Amino acid sequence: MRAHCLLHVPFEGLGSIEPWLKNNGYDISYTRFYESHQLPDVNSVDLLIIMGGPMSVNDEAEYPWLIQEKLFVRKCIDAGKPVLGICLGAQMIASAMGQSVYPGSYKEIGWLPVSSVSDDQRLGAAFPVYSFPDTFTAFHWHGETFDLPAKAIRLASTQACLNQAFQLGERVIGLQFHLETTMGSAAAIVSACRDELVPDEFVQTEKQILAAPEECYLSAKSIMYEILAFLTA
């Protein structure tokens, strides 16, 4: 089995997802857009994972490869491949499905609470729908949000952002937050994006972010692994 991963910057990698893939028999391949824009044949991909990055999906003039990436993501979705989008990756799914991505009312940066929601569409779904815990803590680093793709089911929200997670059909999940975060990956994004830590209602300090207890990482990893198992069942 092959998991193909779309990476946008060197400091936002797979985190805790990588050992799960290896332990579950996946060969891992990458498109690192900061090095090369080469994408595989859709038919060769068994699982697509789209990671985060500081750019916007709207920055096509500065990053022309975004056009190619959106087309590839749409092809994978249309082909029925399991697709997981994280942060920019969730926004990429929304954009690939024809929806708008735009600045949110607030930036969210740090370890912040998330609430599961009961979307009415969940009740009438003809397929299993993932359920988050009622409340949990996840790592956030975003300033933009998006409109849900048509027929997508909202799964989670925060006080600052309505669309934190969604499921599209049986095999596509988008997460605005990061569940793959490790101590190393948290330190890496803080180091690379420290200038974004401008005090605001939903922005933690560097000290607060890096002082998060181990339980935050373990809980996030547990939910991340549940989602991966759900998508690939």
What is the role of each PLM region?
Residues M97-G184:
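Pocket-forming structural segment of enzyme catalytic cores
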Residues W20, W111-P113, A125, W141, ...:
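Tryptophan-centric aromatic hotspots in well-structured domains and transmembrane helices
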Residues G15-S16, D59-A61, A94-A96, A150, ...:
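Short glycine-/acidic-enriched loop or helix-start segments at secondary-structure transitions
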Residues M1-K81, V198-A233:
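N-terminal beta1-alpha1 cap of cysteine-dependent amidohydrolase-like domains
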Residues I50-D120:
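Cysteine-nucleophile active-site neighborhood
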Residues H4, S29-T31, I49, L84, ...:
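Hydrophobic/aromatic beta-strand patches that form the interior of the parallel beta-sheet core
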Residues L155-A156, C161-Q167, R171-A233:
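C-terminal and late-domain segments of enzyme folds
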Residues W20-N23, P64-Q68, V101-Y102, S157, ...:
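Glycine-rich, phosphate-binding/catalytic loops in enzymes
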